Amino acid sequence: MSYPENVVVLKSNHQLKGLFTIIRNRETKREDFIFYSDRIIRLLIEEGLYCLPFHETTITTPTGCEYQGVTFASKICGVSIVRAGESMEAGLRAVCKHIKIGKILIQRDEETALPKLLYAKLPHDIANRQVLLLDPMLATGGTVTQAVEVLLERGVKEENIVFINLVASPEGIKVFTDKYPRVKVVTGEIDSHLNEKKYIIPGLGDFGNLYFGTED
């Protein structure tokens, strides 16, 4: 199946498939789930950084020679969608030293069943930054759509957002990319479908509960 140009799926290989096999296995222990999820998250973060704009720069090496390199074109920050998105913060900090990370909390309104913003704490200059938006699962697309609305209201340009997640549904991909065609999406795998309960199939369950060892 083909997806829009703004959707990047990690190139499948035996190593990556093996990592997903472990975290999707219902028999996997929590410490192993965390360890192997972190490995996938690190790969996703690196791919997300590759999507950001760079500009050329010249530096001098210890040998006194010039080297033509590149650097980020603008400052970056992370924004995690609480709670599950917080599981991806360590992976981001592991490759981006001293990066600022904001948080957005969105929950479903029990009366309307629609996502509702409860809390947002973001860098004051976020409008001038490239934003890596973190949430491990993309099911219906409702939560991340609301999160992007918050970022746009704070002045972030749509094309300056990279949404990073581990597992997505085709339905969620379509909903999200139809609404935000200029937001880049980086995902580990796109699954088969959503079931009648809007769970990703085959999926892996509630990522936040599995990672943090809690239950709803």
UniProtKB/Swiss-Prot annotation:
Cofactor binding mode and count: Binds 1 Mg(2+) ion per subunit. The magnesium is bound as Mg-PRPP.
Function statement: Catalyzes the conversion of uracil and 5-phospho-alpha-D-ribose 1-diphosphate (PRPP) to UMP and diphosphate.
Binding site for uracil: 200, 205-207
EC number: 2.4.2.9
Molecular-function annotations in GO: GTP binding; uracil phosphoribosyltransferase activity
Record's catalysed reaction(s): UMP + diphosphate = 5-phospho-alpha-D-ribose 1-diphosphate + uracil
GO biological process: pyrimidine-containing compound salvage; UMP salvage
Class of enzymatic activity (EC top level): transferase
Pathway stated in the Swiss-Prot or TrEMBL entry: Pyrimidine metabolism; UMP biosynthesis via salvage pathway; UMP from uracil: step 1/1
Homology family: Belongs to the UPRTase family.
Organism: Dictyostelium discoideum
Name this protein carries in UniProt: Uracil phosphoribosyltransferase
